[in-house]
């Protein structure tokens, strides 16, 4: 599952590589921990970190708040990489839903809070027949971002004279665990 459109095929990387630009950190890929898994029309839709930030809880098919097992201090607010690995472990060890997912639930929050603080998520899920005010979302780690790209210096220059790179095609900027909201920084 990926959050990326089918037309996102790495053209920027390919153009740079073909011109002789040096790649860096191409092996790490960021998996967003909460991509929609079900219903099928939702697969790959990114479920914003704001859902957990507003108090959303993760639990497996057995109703267990499993993040307490992996990070008892931060639980559902642990870092994205840790949450993604924890969800994957739950699924691989047989505690995921029938759709290879876990539940992310905000239905215990007052409807007004969901409507005011998570309006996009509410609308996105209503469009596919899930009312997050009354039922949980099914989420799974979802391919989201390549951590590497073209190596640049502090002036956005690659090793190819006259070739500059910016945004998601650059590498050596994020490290192994990209911070939220800086994909185009």
Task: For each feature predicted by the language model, list its residue ranges.
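An anion/pyrophosphate-binding glycine-rich loop and adjacent beta-alpha core
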Residues: 15, 21-131, 135
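A glycine-rich dinucleotide-binding beta-alpha-beta segment and adjacent secondary-structure elements
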Residues: 117-170
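Short helix/loop capping segments that flank catalytic or ligand/cofactor-binding pockets
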Residues: 66-69, 113-114, 156, 160-161, ...
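Glycine-rich phosphate/pyrophosphate-binding beta-alpha loops
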Residues: 1, 31-36, 143, 147, ...
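A conserved FAD-binding loop/helix module that cradles the flavin
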Residues: 1-19, 160, 172-185
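Short, intrinsically disordered, charge-balanced linker/junction segments flanking boundaries
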Residues: 1, 83-84, 88-96, 140, ...
């Amino acid at each position: 599952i990926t959050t990326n459109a089918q037309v996102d095929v790495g053209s920027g990387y390919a153009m740079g590589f073909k011109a002789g630009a040096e790649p860096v950190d191409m092996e790490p890929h960021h998996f967003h921990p909460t991509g929609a898994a079900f219903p099928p029309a939702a697969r790959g839709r990114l479920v914003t970190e704001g859902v957990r930030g507003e108090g959303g809880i993760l639990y497996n098919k057995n109703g267990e708040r499993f993040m307490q097992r992996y990070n008892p201090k931060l639980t559902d607010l642990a870092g994205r990489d840790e949450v993604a690995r924890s969800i994957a472990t739950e699924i691989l060890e047989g505690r995921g839903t029938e759709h290879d997912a876990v539940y992310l639930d905000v239905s215990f929050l007052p409807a007004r809070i969901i409507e005011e603080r998570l309006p996009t998520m509410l609308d996105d899920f209503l469009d596919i027949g899930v009312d997050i005010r009354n039922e949980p979302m099914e989420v799974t780690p979802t391919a989201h971002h390549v951590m590497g790209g073209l190596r640049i210096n502090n002036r956005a220059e690659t090793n190819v004279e006259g070739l500059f790179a910016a945004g998601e095609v650059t590498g050596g900027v994020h490290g192994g665990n990209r911070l939220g909201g800086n994909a185009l920084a």
